[in-house]
């Protein structure tokens, strides 16, 4: 583990090593995940694909996309011929998407219900963790249950609409919405104009925090 983190820390400072690491991540480290019937953690994508079985082409929005195929809810749709928008606050994840899923629009940004400068909490200085969050209470809960320590870093956080505007994303409506952003899920969902975008299916993480009511 320490050797992997040491190499990654070097790769982040060298363009050639960084590119090598990206391809290592896709074709060696996670090769076993490429050829699967389901890419989701709990076979969510099988249900999603069946739900849209009569729709050959469509559009998805994946907020907190993490990886282009490993534990991913939209890769089956991408293989089917769909495309869409993937958003993640970690640049390395978006670079992986740009290599593996060039047919998508991939954006590096943190998302919440307000435009602001805030802190991101990264467990054990591990930039590949799925438990990175902008919510201190979420980080504290993870720390309590998994004994992880966190580093704190200031970043720019944007609303979904602000991202669409700033990156000039051509998105009038979409069919499928997935949100998994470690504690901010319901805030972001409530901030998206669902009447405008009209998704027919929404997948959101049932987090460890008490959920807000969605109306």
Q: How should these model regions be labeled?
A:
Residues 2-215:
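Phosphate/nucleotide-binding beta-alpha loop and adjacent structural elements of enzyme active sites
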């Amino acid at each position: 583990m320490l050797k992997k983190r040491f190499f990654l820390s070097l790769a982040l400072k060298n363009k050639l090593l960084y590119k090598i690491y990206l391809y290592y991540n896709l074709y060696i480290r996670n090769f076993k995940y490429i050829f699967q019937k389901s890419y989701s953690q709990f076979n969510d994508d099988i249900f999603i694909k069946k739900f849209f079985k009569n729709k050959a082409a469509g559009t998805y929005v994946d907020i907190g996309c993490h990886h282009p195929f490993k534990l991913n809810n939209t890769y089956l749709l991408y293989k089917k011929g769909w495309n869409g928008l993937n958003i993640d606050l970690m640049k390395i994840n978006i670079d992986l998407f740009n290599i593996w899923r060039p047919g998508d629009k991939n954006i590096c940004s943190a998302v919440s219900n307000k435009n602001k400068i805030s802190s991101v909490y990264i467990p054990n200085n591990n930039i590949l963790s799925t438990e990175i969050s902008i919510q201190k209470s979420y980080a504290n809960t993870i720390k309590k249950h998994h004994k992880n320590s966190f580093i704190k870093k200031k970043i720019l956080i944007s609303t979904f609409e602000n991202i669409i505007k700033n990156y000039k994303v051509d998105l009038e409506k979409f069919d499928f919405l997935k949100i998994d952003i470690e504690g901010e899920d319901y805030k972001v969902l409530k901030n998206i104009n669902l009447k405008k975008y009209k998704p027919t299916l929404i997948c959101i993480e049932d987090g460890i925090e008490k959920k807000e009511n969605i109306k």
